[in-house]
């Protein structure tokens, strides 16, 4: 069974080699670095910008809770410890 599978695999690789797959007209296999330096980078991509904005807004609303502790100092709710705020103790 395994030898038949090996023969079949060999025949398929000989008939349809991987290098025979045509590339797109504007895509060159020997220039991958140029494809990585497209005009649309992850810093300026509109979809990623909206995600970043949403994350920043959630962080700002999470950390901008203005609570006062017993001494009158600003502090955040107890779940804000993850964001680096000092939680109010009562």
UniProtKB/Swiss-Prot annotation:
Q: Where is the composition biased (Basic and acidic residues)?
A: 25-43
Q: Which residues carry this modification: 4-hydroxyproline?
A: 87
One Pfam family recorded for the sequence:
Conotoxin
| Assigned keywords, A-Z | Amidation, Cleavage on pair of basic residues, Disulfide bond, Hydroxylation, Neurotoxin, Secreted, Signal, Toxin
Q: Does the keyword section mention Signal? A: yes
Q: In which tissues is it expressed?
A: Expressed by the venom duct.
Signal sequence coordinates: 1-22
- Disulfide pairs here are 75-89, 76-85, 81-88
Q: Which GO terms describe its molecular function?
A: ion channel inhibitor activity; toxin activity
Return the annotated region ranges for Disordered: 24-43
Q: Does the keyword Signal apply?
A: yes
Q: What is its main location?
A: secreted
One GO CC annotation, please?
Answer: extracellular region
Where are residues bearing Cysteine amide located in the sequence?
89
Q: Which residues form the propeptide?
A: 23-74
Q: Where in the cell is it found?
A: Secreted
Reading the lineage from the top rank, the first entry is Eukaryota
Q: According to its UniProt record, which protein family does this protein belong to?
A: Belongs to the conotoxin M superfamily.
Q: Tell what the record comments on domains.
A: The cysteine framework is III (CC-C-C-CC). Classified in the M-2 branch, since 2 residues stand between the fourth and the fifth cysteine residues.
Identification of the protein by name: Conotoxin TxMMSK-06
């Amino acid at each position: 069974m395994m030898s038949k599978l090996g023969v079949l695999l060999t025949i398929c690789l000989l008939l349809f080699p991987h290098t025979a797959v045509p590339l797109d007209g504007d895509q060159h296999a020997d220039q991958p670095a140029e494809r990585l330096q497209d005009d649309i980078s992850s810093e300026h991509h509109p979809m990623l910008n909206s995600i970043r904005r949403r994350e920043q807004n959630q962080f700002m609303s999470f950390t901008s809770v203005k609570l006062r502790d017993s001494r009158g100092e600003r502090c955040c709710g107890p779940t804000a410890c993850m964001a680096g705020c000092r939680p109010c103790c009562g």
